[in-house]
Amino acid sequence: NYSVLATPAEGLSGRFTKMDRRKFGKIPGVTDRDYYVNSFHVDVKEPISIVEKIKCEAPFHAITRGGHITYVELDGEAQKNVRAIAKIVKVMHDEGIGYGSINHPVDTCHNCGYKGVIFDKCPVCQSESILRMRRITGYLTGDLSSWNSAKRAEEKDRVKHL
């Protein structure tokens, strides 16, 4: 018996890029950034719709029975648009996604406690001290400050799927 796993390899995505850059030099679109995109995922920089991303990744779920995930990135607070979430889940189901995730920002101002999507500064008190909760592939691991440099670079490059 065997199983194929679409591994996230969170630490390796940055480590292998550095090793390849040393060995092969800086290759545009390959080793010129701090990370490799995990598994069979569409490039995080690719401006693609939610449905397109799901349809592109779905065929790989059937052949990676040992584990897989498809995630989409939203630009707002998910709880404010429950119908959209339900539609995304339905598309994931209909396309055969075995494990799906809907990522959305969860930010909290350390200074005044404001919760919501915060860009550079808190909209209430202008503080730059922000707790930024994000998901790495399939799990939450604390705020961005606990992520390795490769994963922080990837998160910064992630486009929102509309």
Predicted regions and their residues:
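Long, C-terminal-biased catalytic regions of enzyme "large/alpha" subunits
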Residues: 1-162
